[in-house]
Amino acid sequence: MGAAFRFRIHQHGPAGSPVREAFTPMGPKPGWVRLELKAMALNRLDLWTTEGIPGLSLPLPLTPGCDGAGTLEAVGEGTVLPPGVELGGSVMIAPGLSCGVCPACLRGDDMLCASYGVLGHVCDGTAATHVLVPAANLLPIPGNWSFEQAAAFPLVFLTAWEMLVHKCTLRPGETVLVWGGGSGVGSAAIQLVKALGGRAIAVVGSEAKAMKCWELGAEHALVRGDLKALSSKVRELTGKRGVDIVFEHTGAATWPTSMAVCARGGRIVTCGATTGPETPFNLQALFAKQIQIRGSYMGRREHLWTLLSLLQRNPTNPPFHPVIERVFDLADYAEAQRHLEAGQGFGKVVCKV
């Protein structure tokens, strides 16, 4: 690796506006470590951090990027490393940051910590050759995975697991409508629904993406067009009953349809609002159909260990895997942001370092 560099947001702007800068990596403080990154993965949060979020002040200048994997290069004084993690070893990063000592953290609900934040959003992240993170946020990389796969895994699979398992208690045989099946979190959700015995109906923007959803295990893959026609098709596929769970992250544009296709007593869980945060809300439909609505943000860090244990049960034929659409060089991070914003790919966008 050559000279250290990172991408910085000095003022909010459009996708691709972070600028490359040389820097000298700092040593880690007690409880923290420094990684020499080998790969980082982009998420929608990179774009929102770059563009700015109305009403939210971020600590600029800031290096975006919440997913990453690399080599453990330095350890802060007195720092205890997680199981399977050692100096010089290959590790990936759990992106959620919390205080570790409040009641929520102590009972394992770290994403409910009052100081909870995400790497690359509240402190410098992984769009860099090196990054500082708490030691508790490290996990060993499965032996047969590349750094690119490891970087693409944590945020989307942790988010999807929290939504399906802990917010909605997905049961075998239940049907889940997955909006944006070609996104990172959508492609993770399709695989987890199948692995947990559910039936996924994916919604995507093209026939090519629909084919890839089927390959991941979706029972049906619908090309989004007219939303009323889509709603009718979903009800047809479910015997007019509707779906048990709606996996929402698209927001305002799809919310009325999510309400319409949700079965009586069904659940809608949301982790995002890509098309906007405000939408008309039919309270009568909510109580008449007894729909349960649940918000979800990231997930419990310990559940990444649960996901790793599921992978280790069958390493030659894993039940799920990160889907990577394209790999850029880190030097082309700005271009990678613009590519992600265009939304034409299927799966995760990754930068190798």
Enumerate the language-model features and the residues they cover.
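NAD(P)H dinucleotide-binding glycine-rich loop of Rossmann-like/cofactor-binding domains
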Residues: 97-180
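Short glycine-centered segments of the SAM/dcSAM-binding site in methyltransferase folds
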Residues: 90, 175, 199, 266-267, ...
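Glycine-rich beta-strand-centered segment in the early N-terminal region that forms part
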Residues: 25-41, 53-106, 142-144
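Rossmann-fold dehydrogenase core element
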Residues: 264-271, 281-322
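N-terminal Rossmann NAD(P)H-binding glycine-rich loop of SDR-like oxidoreductase domains
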Residues: 182, 190
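Adenosine-nucleotide cofactor-binding segment
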Residues: 178, 194-254
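C-terminal hydrophobic helical "lid"/dimerization subdomain
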Residues: 2, 256, 301-353
